[in-house]
């Protein structure tokens, strides 16, 4: 199990979505609600925060939504990725996404 050497560090899992132009407001809302629900369904998720892009820099490349999940360890993150609820979410979101960007990092206090 990979755990940061500093107990105060947190593993951040960042997921950004770019929706297809055919995705409706209802499709997008369904994705938002379903992603939020993963926090209650998957115990390894310590925190889940999300929002929509408000940057004025115009470098978003069409990505509109960003979700940040916190885990205590890489093992917890891996359990989340393999969890049946996460896999079901992937099937829900896949048809309405044009692209997805994911990055994980150990945050420093």
Summary of predicted features, one role per range:
Residues 36-42, 87-90, 97:
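A common structural junction motif
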Residues 22, 84-87, 93:
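Generic hydrophobic alpha-helical segments
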């Amino acid at each position: 199990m990979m755990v940061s050497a500093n107990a105060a560090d947190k593993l951040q899992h960042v997921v950004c979505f770019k929706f297809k132009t055919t995705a409706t407001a209802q499709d997008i809302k369904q994705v938002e609600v379903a992603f939020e629900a993963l926090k209650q369904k998957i115990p390894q998720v310590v925190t889940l925060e999300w929002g929509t892009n408000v940057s004025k820099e115009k470098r978003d490349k069409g990505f509109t939504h960003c979700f940040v999940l916190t885990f205590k360890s890489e093992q917890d993150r891996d359990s989340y990725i393999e969890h049946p609820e996460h896999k079901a979410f992937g099937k829900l979101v896949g048809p309405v996404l044009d692209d997805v960007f994911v990055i994980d990092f150990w945050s420093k206090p």
